[in-house]
Amino acid sequence: MELATRSQIPKEVADIFNAPSDDEEFVGFQDDVPMENLSESCGSLDSLELEKQNACLHSKYFTEELRRIFKEDTDSDNEDFEGFTESELNIGSNPELIESELSDGDKTHPMMSDEEDDDDEEEAAPRRGRQSTRSSFGLRVAFQFPTKKTAKTPDKNSPHLLGGKTDLRREKSCRQPKEKEDSASDAEDESRAESQETSDALLKRAMNIKENKAMLAQLLAELNSVPDFFPVRTPPSASRRRTPRRAFSEGQITRRVNPTRSARPPEKFALENFTFSATKLTEELYSFRRRKTISGGKCQKYRRHRISSFRSVKDITEEELENIAITVRDKVYDKVLGNTCHQCRQKTIDTKTVCRNQGCGGVRGQFCGPCLRNRYGEDVRTALLDPKWTCPPCRGICNCSYCRRRDGRCATGILIHLAKFYGYDNVKEYLESLQKQL
């Protein structure tokens, strides 16, 4: 039985199993199904072929004889296929089988999806099942060899790709202005909303200010309608604020005393502390006691000489005469080296007068050039060169503030401009004219 079945295998079929297939791919094995469901499996296979359009599942070697062999059921599942013998390979010279294979090879698609072919296959299947008495393989293989489709790499310079790129660029360029327009419109909407909010806030503020002003005016009107509730205080007049000026009395004048100043430096200010040694102190005491015993208990008294500013005409030098101040601008102030003027009490370094009276001395007889000319109408140069010249205080005509206060009169102040206005050359003549009028 096994030999009978093997004798039916042609050489071309054996070549299919023995020859290596480089251009064909093995899809897989088909499960064992009974003959009753074979037609249904073939229908499902056809539908699957229609779904997979890109894969070509037909082969030129898939003949009718090969289909019949694989559709037959095996008698025993334990038998294995061990290969083809030489006799089976030589038997393939049967002309009938060769013609059937050639006729089947001319067909491009042996597994057609037409209804007529399906009916023929369903009728031939039970006939082959009855006639076959051999034991076939335990495995049935469905040879479906899809043709390889080489994946064509797209050319970068192809017109289709270039056209697609240009289309994409155009779309992007169209989208960008649209996005800009959308963003600009959004920004305009936001700015309008903000301006609307600010305008609403300003209007609300103006309304509140107006209401507050109206309320304040109403309250002030109500307060003014009740004058007794809030009495209005009249400010005191300026005449009441002024204290009456004390009239100058002709009575006794108190002596002028310098006020006590808290800023006055303490006693012994800026004095150096000289330390004496004990030996020197004992020597001084010893010498003092010795002089006392020698003199008979009486200490020697030295005669005190009063330093006077009296200077003769011969002592006046030409430099001192040139140093006389004619105007106020010629006076140079110096609190260390300068001497004080009796009239203006300013300490300057210019040359001043010297009183020739023996009982006068110090600041009393010193007058600067502007004061002596404006107040008394005299010149410092002639006073220095006159050996008999005496100062105004010694003559009793001094009109300074201290001398007038001592005599019970008030200070005159600056009267030179008023005296010149009335035609007088100095203040002394103007005061004498006033005294005559009284």
UniProtKB/Swiss-Prot annotation:
Give the residue ranges for region: Disordered.
72-199
Region PSIP1-binding: which residues?
A: 55-114
Q: Which UniProt keywords apply?
A: Cytoplasm, Isopeptide bond, Nucleus, Phosphoprotein, Repressor, Transcription, Transcription regulation, Ubl conjugation
Post-translational events:
Phosphorylation increases its interaction with PSIP1.
Answer yes or no on keyword Transcription regulation: yes
Segments carrying motif Integrase domain-binding motif 1 (IBM1):
9-33
Where do Acidic residues bias regions lie?
Answer: 74-85, 113-123
Protein role: Plays a role in transcriptional regulation as a repressor that inhibits monoamine oxidase A (MAOA) activity and gene expression by binding to the promoter. Plays an important oncogenic role in mediating the full transforming effect of MYC in medulloblastoma cells. Involved in apoptotic signaling pathways; May act downstream of P38-kinase and BCL-2, but upstream of CASP3/caspase-3 as well as CCND1/cyclin D1 and E2F1.
What's an example GO BP annotation here? regulation of DNA-templated transcription
Q: Please identify the protein, giving its name as recorded.
A: Cell division cycle-associated 7-like protein
Where along the sequence does the record place the motif called Integrase domain-binding motif 2 (IBM2)?
A: 62-88
Q: Where in the cell is it found?
A: Cytoplasm; Nucleus
List the biased-composition ranges (Basic and acidic residues): 166-183
**Primary location class:** cytoplasm
Q: Which organism is it from?
A: Rattus norvegicus
Q: Which sequence positions carry the modification called Phosphothreonine?
A: T74, T85
Q: Which GO terms describe its cellular component?
A: cytosol; fibrillar center; nucleoplasm; nucleus
In residue numbers, the region (MYC-binding) covers: 201-223
Which residues are annotated as modified residue Phosphoserine in the UniProt record? S21, S76, S100, S103, S113, S135, S136, S183, S185, S249
User: How does the annotation summarize its subunit structure?
Assistant: Interacts with MYC. Interacts (via IBM motifs) with PSIP1 (via IBD domain); phosphorylation increases its affinity for PSIP1.
Q: Name the domain of life.
A: Eukaryota
| InterPro entries per UniProt | CDCA7/CDA7L (IPR040221), Znf-4CXXC_R1 (IPR018866)
Chain positions of cross-link Glycyl lysine isopeptide (Lys-Gly) (interchain with G-Cter in SUMO2): K210, K213
Instruction: State the encoding gene.
Output: Cdca7l
